[in-house]
Amino acid sequence: MLYLIGLGLGDEKDITLRGMEIAKRCECFIETYTSKWEGDLRSLERIIEQPIKSVRRKDLEDGQKEFLNNCKEKNVALFVLGDPLAATTHIDLILEAKRMKIDVKIIHNSSVFSALGEFGLQMYKYGRTVTVPFSNKLESVKDAITNNKKFGLHTLLLLDLDAEVGLYMTVKNALKILLDAKLIKKNDKIIAGKIGTNIYYDNVSNLFEKNIETPSCIVIPGKLHFLEKEYLEEIL
């Protein structure tokens, strides 16, 4: 059997009680290529009283069947940063497991999508979410921002990363890309920050002066409800 266990947005202490109990009776693996983990692997091993092997992207994509064959003979737990179903990689893994008649159990945890409430915007007013890429391929970003604005919806922009080599797009990098593409203006008021730490609602020009940790994200607000506006101006 395969268990996909979310680790949440923080460190090893964010594992759920259910996830911890299940992991104690499994062969355990962890992937850290979909985001940046703030935790410590050795501390997590002490919590679950089991050794944990790290797996890379190619292990779960190119070596998918080999990984899943292991789940036919024993209980296997794969630790995933955030929530297990926030990345398409894990959807594909589940589909292949089902084709191989392997049972899969999801242990959910918090993700950037569930923690967005910290920004003070109403959840049902978010439109399409996109990632600002390192490449110049911005068509999907342009479409999302334009269409969301048309309907007064907020746009969540995730920032590109390559965790396996420790490369994370900064807010400053993303703002420059968006400015160069004329998708935002220097006097636009937007939200930028790292959930759980420093979050700012300010003009784009002022955000360049902020020291924002990675991984971070940006929200371009749509039409604001008066309560949303009060929260942004008084809390952030």
Where are these regions (language model features)?
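Class I SAM-dependent methyltransferase SAM-binding "motif I" and its flanking Rossmann-like core
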Residues: 82-155
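A contiguous loop/helix-start segment that scaffolds small-molecule binding in enzyme catalytic cores
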Residues: 2-4, 148-236
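Structural motif
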Residues: 1-3, 27-28, 52, 75-78, ...
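Short amphipathic alpha-helix with an adjacent loop that forms part of the alpha/beta core around
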Residues: 65-70, 145-146, 206-210
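Class I S-adenosyl-L-methionine
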Residues: 1-103
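Short, acidic/turn-prone active-site loops that include or flank metal/cofactor-
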Residues: 8-10, 33-36, 56-60, 110-112, ...
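Conserved beta-strand termini and adjacent loop/short-helix elements that scaffold enzyme active sites
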Residues: 55-57, 107, 192-194
